């Protein structure tokens, strides 16, 4: 869909790649998606951008996280061990290193900001906006307190808060995930789009990096249904 092979100026942004609802014998084998993305990163250097999300952070840090009534961190590890046997620990270590290399956000020169989420309103007094411009430390991943943790777990952002972050970071349009959006795309505020790509009404949003950032209304009508492209996995 992104036609990466046609131009080095074509990019694709990905997030929340693991802990799906397709289990095999009760095991989560979504490590395969990470491997597929890692292969694309190597094949198209500088064009494929996996961003850190709450499920990847939880897996890397060993924090329990639930989805669909099950504890996914353990299921993921059990899946890796089941497939790789005695090499499971080495594979898990490599997965952790890959996740640790994921940035929190991608910002286009036209002011389009892509991230899994942003801090909730109550977290702003403790949030360090410079976290997106520096190398992350272990403290940034700390539950509830780390600015990196806030970036992938925050919910319920307000318009006033988004305007403050837009001013600090010089952003025209925020593209976020994390929150469930029944129709695949919705407005999260005057300059915020919420996207879902993990259910039957999933959409993607093509954005030009050379033109001015689209307004929220333009983005709403510019989204494309993933169903039209069949099974891409």
Predicted feature residues:
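Feature recognizes metal-dependent phosphohydrolase scaffolds
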Residues: 1-233
């Amino acid at each position: 869909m992104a036609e990466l092979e046609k131009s080095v100026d074509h990019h694709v942004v990905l997030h929340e790649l693991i802990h799906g609802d397709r289990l095999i014998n009760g095991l989560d084998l979504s490590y395969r998606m990470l491997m597929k993305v890692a292969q694309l990163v190597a094949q198209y250097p500088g064009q494929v951008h996996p961003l850190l999300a709450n499920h990847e952070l939880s897996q890397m840090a060993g924090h329990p996280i639930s989805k669909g009534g099950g504890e996914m961190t353990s299921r993921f590890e059990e899946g890796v061990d089941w497939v790789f046997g005695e090499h499971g620990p080495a594979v898990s270590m490599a997965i952790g290193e890959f996740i640790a290399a994921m940035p929190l956000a991608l910002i286009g020169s036209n002011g389009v900001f892509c991230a899994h989420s942003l801090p909730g309103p109550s977290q702003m007094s403790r949030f360090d906006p410079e976290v997106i411009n520096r190398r992350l430390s272990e403290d940034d991943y700390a539950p509830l307190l780390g600015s990196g943790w806030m970036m992938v777990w925050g919910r319920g952002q307000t318009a006033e808060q988004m305007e403050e972050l837009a001013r600090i970071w010089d952003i025209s349009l925020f593209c976020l995930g994390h929150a469930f959006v029944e129709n695949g795309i919705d407005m999260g505020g005057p300059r915020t789009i919420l996207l879902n790509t993990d259910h039957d009404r999933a959409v993607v949003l093509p954005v030009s990096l050379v033109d001015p950032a689209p307004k929220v209304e333009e983005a709403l009508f510019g989204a494309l249904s993933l169903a039209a492209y069949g099974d891409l996995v």
